[in-house]
A protein has these predicted regions:
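Periplasmic c-type cytochrome electron-transfer domains
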Residues: 1-180
Length: 180
């Protein structure tokens, strides 16, 4: 499954926390999904920053709800010294970053998702992850093809994905079919 190439054999488990379930987000409408995730992330980071500022100003703890776009992610409590208690955070990591991609929601952007997918499913490595700057070689997988996917290639692929229209419902014109 996606990202399994990053796990060693010693990680084999039957725990549901590390399952091979499928629930991967579709690519149609993915640009909108990524924008929403970024907006929600920014909202929560701003809420946390405001709580930290208020706690510093008042000299006492400030508890705030993490509510964005009608979705609650629990709460954080900021202390006057800048520490933030995240024990009440739910449904998102304590860094408050929404990661909408991959089957477990562990990938932050379509670009990261696509770099992983191109490597895992097509055996093609993006220069920005597997190229000379990061690995010291232009042919990380030693298949005799150097610089397989440039930054421009990856940008074009991600822009294509991001611009795919969201799915829509088409109601048949035949009333019998429409009623079915």
């Amino acid at each position: 499954f996606v990202l399994a190439q990053n796990l060693g054999a010693d990680t084999h488990t039957f725990s549901p926390e590390f399952s091979n379930e499928r629930g991967t987000t579709g690519m149609h409408g993915s640009g909108l999904i990524e924008l929403l995730a970024r907006e929600m992330t920014n909202d929560m980071l701003a809420i946390r920053a405001a709580a930290i500022a208020e706690a510093a100003n008042t000299g006492g703890p400030v508890r705030v709800e993490l509510l964005t776009k009608g979705v609650s992610f629990g709460a954080v409590t900021a202390q006057a010294n800048g520490d933030v208690n995240t024990d009440e955070v739910e449904g998102v990591g304590i860094d408050l970053v929404i990661r909408p991609w991959s089957q477990k929601g562990v990938t932050i952007s379509m670009r990261e998702f696509t770099i992983n997918a191109m490597n895992h499913h097509h055996g093609m490595q993006a220069v920005e992850r597997y190229g000379m700057t990061r690995t010291g070689t232009r042919d990380f997988d030693q298949d005799l093809v150097v610089d397989e996917l440039t930054a421009g290639d990856m940008t074009a692929i991600v822009l294509f994905q991001a611009s795919l229209a969201p799915p829509s419902q088409v109601i048949p014109e035949n009333p019998d079919f429409a009623a079915a």
